Amino acid sequence: FSLAAKIYGLKTVDESFANSSNNITRFYVMSKNENKDFDPDKTYISSFLFSVNNTPGSLFKVMGGFATNNVNMIKLESYNYGADFVITQFYCEIEGHPGQENTKFALNDMYHYCSKVRKLGVFEKSTYRSRQ
């Protein structure tokens, strides 16, 4: 039974929908200022949005920059937008902090091949992910 449904008096549609020990809900905390200085004793995840240049192989080259610099990409989602949905934007999460040398090099490659890059944030990697 959903706790949220109980609190707000809502009808539960399916009681077994999320009954897996691996299910998680993620919440994002937004700030105008960066708040995660690099600590070499911690593991980080960085998230960003980017659009590649409209040239053959641009996405491949962005991905290659992460691979070459030994940066693990853990999530990549694509979204089409624009009047005719011809522009593709990607949401990406990587293991790493922009203060780490290898991540810095990978991001420099990324800026070279992308028409737009927007850093969304950096957060400490949850111990939950380490169990996966």
Model-flagged regions — what are they?
Residues F1-Q132:
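Domain-level signature for soluble enzymes in the chorismate/prephenate branch of the shikimate pathway
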